[in-house]
Curated annotation (Swiss-Prot):
NCBIfam families: PRK05339.1. This is Putative phosphoenolpyruvate synthase regulatory protein. InterPro entries: Kinase-pyrophosphorylase, PSRP. Its EC number is 2.7.11.33, 2.7.4.28. It comes from Bordetella pertussis (strain Tohama I / ATCC BAA-589 / NCTC 13251).
Length: 275
């Protein structure tokens, strides 16, 4: 008999976008499979009035649930931080935990600037990310083959193995110009890489997937089709992996990996630097 998962509310509180706190909370909470976490995102808590509303909400949840919710905070304003810290939650101050130690090590005080890590509207890094996103969108699924020489990496694999989300994640997070190109039954019959990408062998990295998982994904898109049959998926995956081995192309299986793990592996294998 399967026991009912424990439920716990999680509040992600920030005076900016909350992206940092949310990313950190996902990484930490994923270690506890037996708990069904209920995340509540509360960005732009930048006034005392908003902070009081947050405290009331957290306290109400603690009273109704009978257990204190978990609170991840990247609040910077000292007054707002002090107010929310008094709530009846398990309060985790992500910036304070690390910033004070760094201040001590450097002998300097931090700027306490809200949203500093995301204030990039006019920066070169921001423009590089936008350029990378536009490039990846234009070069998705082999639809635009010009300027492949400008790609930092070209992802290969059968349809629906995770090429598109990985390309976009690399672009958005690391400003990597990632193109992706499908391997199709026509390529397997020819027994050669598509001519379009053959000149860029040094940029190629392959993605694969377990046939059973591929069949599930394809059935969501085109139910009961030849494209989604398990036998067809087994054939395509086997042929794609055979081709990548023969051509000396590094590759990995995406089946049990998160998008973050896939992207990190690609960066390491291709030798790209994080931005």
């Amino acid at each position: 008999m399967t026991s009912t998962p424990i439920e716990r509310a999680v509040y992600i509180v920030s005076d900016s976008t909350g992206i940092t706190a949310e990313t950190f909370s996902h990484s930490v909470l994923s270690q506890f499979d037996e708990v069904n976490f209920k995340p509540v995102r509360l960005p732009f808590i930048d006034t005392l009035d908003k902070a009081r509303e947050v405290v009331a909400r957290i306290n109400r949840n603690a009273l109704e649930a009978g257990v204190p919710p978990i609170v991840f905070s990247t609040l910077v304003n000292p007054e707002i931080l002090a107010l929310v810290r008094q709530s009846n939650g398990v309060f985790l101050d992500l910036f304070g935990t690390f910033v004070s130690h760094i201040e001590q090590a450097l002998g300097l005080k931090s700027s306490h600037s809200i949203g500093r890590s995301h204030m990039a509207a006019n920066s070169e890094k921001y423009r590089n990310r936008i350029d990378a996103i536009n490039f990846s969108l234009a070069h998705d699924d082999g639809q635009f083959v010009n300027q492949l020489d400008q790609a930092d990496v070209i992802l290969l694999g059968v349809s629906r193995c995770g090429k598109t989300p990985t390309s976009l994640y690399l672009a958005m997070q690391y400003a990597v110009k990632a193109a992706n190109f499908p391997l199709t039954p026509d390529d397997f019959e020819r027994g050669a890489l598509p001519k379009t990408i053959a000149p860029y062998r040094g940029k190629l990295f392959g993605l694969s997937i377990q046939p059973e998982r591929l069949a599930e994904v394809r059935n969501e898109r085109r139910p009961n089709s030849h494209y989604a049959r398990l036998e067809q998926c087994r054939y395509e995956v086997a042929e794609a992996e055979r081709m990548m081995r023969r051509e000396g192309i590094s590759w990995l299986s995406t089946t049990t990996k998160s998008i973050e793990e896939i992207a990190t592996t690609v960066l390491q294998e291709v030798g790209l630097e994080r931005v």
